[in-house]
């Protein structure tokens, strides 16, 4: 077997083109690219406005089975498929999310594809990139500062300090900041109250940026944020604090999508980064809709498995933005099938056909779930060197028994040459007109019924359970006019249940709803289930321990 290069070695050896050249490939004039160095740029708002009349290309969603520690390669497949479509003569753009610093220094490592299916410049994308996350964090925390400042200077709006619901954020995993008391230290520092931090990717400002259609829409949504309640339970909005204008100013440049390139010099839009387990998990609407005006095909991903990312992509992003996906790709691996079939991580390299067959139940559930949205799907088997022909065939046979097709993909090792078959299959599906996309539930359905619909139809649980205070809160929001909003489920990504260790395709479980949060600006209700946290912690040995600068000043250990 040939020597296997690391992702970073491959990325550093990339022959990148000037970003203006990449823009020209999809019709973006140089004057409408705002460069950040030679290999990344923002696309001007004027250009985005100018292409609104163009015909839309076809939208392809890449999703996956429930993630395992073995790794599925969803971003890698998204990037590979974009390259593959360009290889077979289609004009394609990849749309993915920006990486969060917290997980990069925690457990995940870099997020820009892998092998010969990567987006570059990888190091920049995994660190500060073009400053979007900084802008989002700053806008969010400006609002936090304005709340406490308003209370300090007399509290004219009558904010009940026990009912401030706007928490602070930072782009780092730090469990010590989850719950805290702020404004300690005497009269000069304000009125002490309970508060806390979430990670930036869970911020409502992040969700708003990713769902806004333009700057005007952005400012309106920012004004709609509910920051606190008065003693009579009436809401206090960000616009009551006159925060929306200044927040929009901080986010003006961050609203513009970022253009970068794949290893094969094809265009990629990287913009926004909400997590899919604690937020809606999709890149920005502006990036996706702009890409659709410039390409025949737009390949995008939604975070984690189809039970989380794809459900939110369909029920939140597509519903809000009027998008109609033409086809879906479900990424799965032999290794993950074995893990779902009960094999331990250290034994995944050994052939075990029975475990593959047993673990396929998880894949089957995701295939059924995508069908519920009326979108035709194909399974991409992301190839690992340890996979045997018999194991691959067992997966293909299972998918065929479900009435779908599985295609073996070797883009990690071969780039676009290893994914041509999938590219052709996706084109055939998209061009067939078979997609009859519809969200899972109507707008008018009561909020708790929406939760139960997802629990029963997607997770195959028996019901959602919630105490009276949660149900009363949902009812109060319905009475206040928020009943038409979609729900955004926050739960573990590792299982259809709320137990991360319950793999495979469980049925009949209950899903406990711990807390609900109204994101009035983003336009959804967050449903926090089980033990999921909106501020993650670092593991015992965080990946930051292995990250350093070598003697040449290059970054080591980030990927």
From Swiss-Prot:
Entry binding sites for ATP: 68-75
Record SUPFAM superfamilies: P-loop containing nucleoside triphosphate hydrolases (SSF52540)
E.C. number(s) listed in UniProt: 6.3.4.3
Pfam families, A to Z: FTHFS (PF01268)
Pathway the protein contributes to: One-carbon metabolism; tetrahydrofolate interconversion
InterPro entries hit by this protein: Formate_THF_ligase (IPR000559), Formate_THF_ligase_CS (IPR020628), P-loop_NTPase (IPR027417)
Disulfide cross-links: none
Keyword entries, A-Z: ATP-binding, Ligase, Nucleotide-binding, One-carbon metabolism
Reaction it catalyzes: (6S)-5,6,7,8-tetrahydrofolate + formate + ATP = (6R)-10-formyltetrahydrofolate + ADP + phosphate
Single GO term (MF): formate-tetrahydrofolate ligase activity
Matching PROSITE patterns: FTHFS_1, FTHFS_2
Gene3D superfamilies, A to Z: Domain 2, N(10)-formyltetrahydrofolate synthetase (3.30.1510.10), Formyltetrahydrofolate synthetase, domain 3 (3.10.410.10), P-loop containing nucleotide triphosphate hydrolases (3.40.50.300)
Keyword ATP-binding: yes
GO biological process: tetrahydrofolate interconversion
Family to which the UniProt record says this protein belongs: Belongs to the formate--tetrahydrofolate ligase family.
Protein name: Formate--tetrahydrofolate ligase
Organism: Mesorhizobium japonicum (strain LMG 29417 / CECT 9101 / MAFF 303099) (Mesorhizobium loti (strain MAFF 303099))
């Amino acid at each position: 077997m040939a020597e296997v290069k690391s992702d970073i070695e491959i990325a550093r050896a990339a022959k990148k083109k000037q970003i203006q050249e990449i823009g020209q490939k999809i019709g973006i004039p140089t004057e409408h690219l705002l460069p950040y160095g030679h290999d990344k740029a923002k696309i001007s708002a004027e250009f985005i406005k100018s292409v609104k009349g163009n015909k839309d290309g076809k939208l392809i969603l890449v999703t996956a089975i429930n993630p395992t520690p073995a790794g599925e390669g969803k971003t890698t497949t998204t990037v590979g498929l974009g390259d593959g479509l360009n290889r077979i003569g289609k004009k394609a753009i990849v749309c993915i999310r920006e990486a969060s610093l917290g997980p990069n220094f925690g457990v995940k490592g870099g997020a820009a594809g892998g092998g010969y299916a990567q987006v570059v410049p990888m190091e920049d994308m995994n660190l500060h990139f073009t400053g979007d996350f900084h802008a989002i964090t700053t806008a969010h925390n400006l609002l936090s500062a304005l709340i406490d400042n308003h209370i300090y200077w007399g509290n004219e709006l009558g904010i009940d300090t026990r009912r401030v619901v706007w928490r602070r954020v930072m782009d780092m995993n730090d469990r010590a900041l989850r719950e805290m008391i702020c404004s300690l230290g005497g009269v000069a520092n304000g009125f002490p109250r309970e508060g806390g931090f979430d990670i930036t990717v869970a911020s409502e400002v992040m969700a708003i940026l990713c769902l806004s259609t333009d700057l005007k829409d952005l400012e309106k949504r920012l004004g709609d944020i509910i920051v606190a309640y008065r003693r009579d339970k009436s809401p206090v909005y960000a616009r009551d604090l006159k925060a929306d204008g200044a927040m929009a100013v901080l986010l003006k440049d961050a609203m513009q999508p970022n253009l970068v390139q794949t290893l094969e010099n094809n265009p990629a839009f990287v913009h926004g980064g909400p997590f899919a387990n604690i937020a809606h998990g999709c890149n920005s609407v502006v990036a996706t809709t702009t890409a659709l005006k410039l390409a025949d095909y737009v390949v995008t991903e939604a975070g984690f498995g189809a039970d989380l990312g794809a459900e939110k992509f369909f029920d939140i992003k597509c519903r809000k933005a009027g998008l109609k996906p033409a086809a879906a790709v479900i990424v799965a691996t032999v290794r993950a099938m074995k893990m779902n079939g009960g094999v331990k991580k250290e034994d995944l390299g050994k052939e075990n056909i029975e475990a593959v067959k047993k673990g396929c139940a998880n894949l089957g559930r995701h295939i059924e779930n995508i069908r519920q949205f009326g979108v035709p799907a194909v399974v991409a088997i992301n190839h690992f060197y340890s996979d045997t022909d018999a194991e691959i065939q067992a997966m293909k046979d299972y998918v065929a028994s479900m009435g779908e097709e599985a295609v073996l993909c070797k883009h990690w090792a071969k780039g676009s040459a290893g994914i041509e078959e999938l590219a052709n299959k996706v084109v055939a599906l998209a061009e067939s007109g078979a997609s009859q996309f519809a969200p899972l539930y109507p707008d008018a359905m009561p909020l708790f019924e929406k939760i139960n619909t997802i629990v029963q139809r997607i997770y195959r649980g028996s019901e959602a359970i919630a105490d009276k205070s949660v149900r009363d809160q949902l009812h109060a929001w319905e009475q206040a006019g928020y009943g038409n909003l979609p729900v955004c489920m926050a739960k573990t990504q590792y299982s259809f249940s709320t137990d991360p260790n319950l793999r495979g395709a469980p049925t009949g479980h209950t899903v406990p709803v711990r807390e609900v949060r109204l994101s009035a600006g983003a336009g959804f209700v967050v449903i926090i289930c089980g033990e999921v946290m909106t501020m993650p912690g670092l593991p015992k040995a965080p990946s930051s321990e292995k990250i350093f600068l070598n003697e040449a000043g290059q970054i080591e250990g980030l990927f």
